[in-house]
Amino acid sequence: MKKILVTGGCGYIGSHTIVDLLENGFEVISVDDNSRSTTYAMGAIEQLTGKKIRNYTVDLKNYDATHNIFSENKDITGIIHFAAFKAVGESCEFPMKYYENNLFSLINLLKCVQEFNIPHFVFSSSCTVYGNPDSIPVTEAFPVKKAESPYGATKQMGETILQDFSKVNSTSSILLRYFNPVGAHPSILLGEVPLGKPMNLVPAITQTAIGKLPKMFVWGSDYPTRDGSCIRDYIHVCDIANAHTLALQYLIEKRNSTNCDVFNLGSGDGVSVLEAIKMFEAVSGVSLNYEIGPRRSGDVVAIYANNDFAVKTLGWKPKYGLNEMMDTAWKWELKLKNEKIGV
């Protein structure tokens, strides 16, 4: 059984990926400093899989503490690196916090990868690396343009660091550029536990619907899109999680064409903010109180994926549609309220 280290394992995507890894026969350890997550996910993972996961409560910016994880686990086969700050708007307000956290943690990990000869590394990247693309859908061959936010810039820099690292080390790597993960595990035992105000659309929708927020804002209605609001590619978190398992299997089986392959992870469908709101209202039966606000700094106008490369090469096939994304997100929000999770 191959051991995988998941960074950010208590977080939204990390926790769902741990479940998928365990269901596919991997052994998993986690590291998460819980600065933007809670330990709730570890209990939910055990409930779903029957397996207790060790989580190291370590800040990856602390090199010595990070190094100790590798010293205690010299049989790590691969790393999936999720741990990062990820809010576009916040990154525009506090850019140095994002550069320090997202880049120092990656560099410390790669120092340990080099010392302990870890063979496989999967990097959680983002469609933000494409900036405002000249056309859509975007393929992996599209140029990486000037980032629209410091968050996007940290993902671009992280990709460059890993590509340069892979040229001179034996570690095989994959960059997974994913679009907008939403929804919750279909069991509704696991989902995104909110800390502070929501930074992304779907948590803002569900928290407004349940009354946690008095209203939500649609940032911008004058974009050159079909209804004036931004267009995004929403993908169910379980589909994203499964792609990470497939990416690791792809590396372990030595099917990679280069030492650092790149894949888009999106549904391939562009959905506007207003269309997402309408879908939620249809699924939940709740009418949302929302207000049109000004454009928000750092937001890309429209982007969605061409996912052909991941589908053909990894054998990945997204299973969940937008209605299921909204349905599981809403059921999870109801669970959060009823069970006072994250309060």
Language-model-derived ranges and their functions:
Residues 1-184:
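N-terminal Rossmann-like NAD(P)+-binding domain of SDR-like oxidoreductases, especially those catalyzing
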Residues 99, 148-156, 191, 195-199, ...:
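Short-chain dehydrogenase/reductase
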Residues 58, 204-343:
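C-terminal substrate-binding subdomain of Rossmann-fold SDR/epimerase-dehydratase oxidoreductases
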Residues 4-10, 127, 148, 179, ...:
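Short glycine- and Lys/Arg-enriched binding-loop motifs that mark or flank ligand-binding interfaces
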